[in-house]
């Protein structure tokens, strides 16, 4: 009886010790549009540890100051891909950039170059289905970015296992700008 009680208490202590830790800090999850007066550059993002893999030609993306594809490691040293779009202001990001971003986000994303409004970098916005798929599913593609946030004058497109994780990844990178 004592042995069962001791084992139960040890098990309970382990569960309580591990149960409070989450993989992300959900208390810092940002709204989709926030920090309206913030003005950021790609250098602000690279100063957080964001690594640029590719800078896109934005000559056909009206009023954009630049778009960069790259990755960033969060506090748990886990790397995620992002696309960062910078505009002169949040107002211009909303007016000129929102439709282009919403077109490539989520399940209904436009991922064919022939159908996309802004073709530059479209190959980096696609993912192939996992290796466990077979048949026609094995060759299907899906959107890499499941969510985005508009943080000041920047638009941050984020990956994640689902919408909640993607939003948290957006928030984690954006919140790191203020550290």
Where is each model-derived feature located?
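A short, solvent-exposed beta-edge/loop patch
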Residues: 118-179
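C-terminal motif of bacterial Sec signal peptides marking the signal peptidase cleavage site
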Residues: 15-17
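Positively charged n-region of N-terminal signal peptides that target proteins for export
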Residues: 1-4
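Second-shell loop/turn segments in exported
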Residues: 27-32, 80-86, 154-163
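N-terminal "mature-domain start" segment
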Residues: 19-76, 167-179
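Short, solvent-exposed recognition patches
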Residues: 42, 46-136, 140-141
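Repetitive helical segments and hydrophobic/amphipathic motifs
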Residues: 11-12
């Amino acid at each position: 009886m004592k042995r069962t009680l001791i084992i139960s208490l040890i098990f309970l202590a382990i569960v309580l010790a591990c149960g409070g830790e989450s993989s992300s800090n959900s208390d810092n999850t940002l709204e989709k549009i926030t920090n309206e007066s913030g003005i950021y550059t790609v250098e602000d993002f690279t100063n957080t540890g964001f690594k640029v893999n590719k800078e896109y030609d934005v000559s056909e993306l009206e009023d954009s100051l630049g778009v960069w594809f790259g990755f960033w490691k969060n506090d748990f040293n886990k790397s995620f891909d992002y696309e960062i779009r910078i505009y002169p202001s949040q107002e211009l990001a909303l007016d000129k950039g929102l439709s282009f971003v919403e077109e490539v986000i989520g399940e209904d994303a436009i991922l064919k170059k022939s159908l996309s409004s802004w073709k530059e970098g479209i190959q980096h916005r696609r993912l192939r289905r996992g290796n466990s798929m077979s048949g026609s599913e094995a060759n299907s593609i899906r959107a890499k970015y499941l969510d985005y946030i508009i943080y000041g004058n920047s638009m941050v497109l984020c990956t994640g296992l689902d919408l909640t994780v993607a939003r948290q990844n957006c928030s984690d990178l954006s919140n790191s700008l203020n550290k």
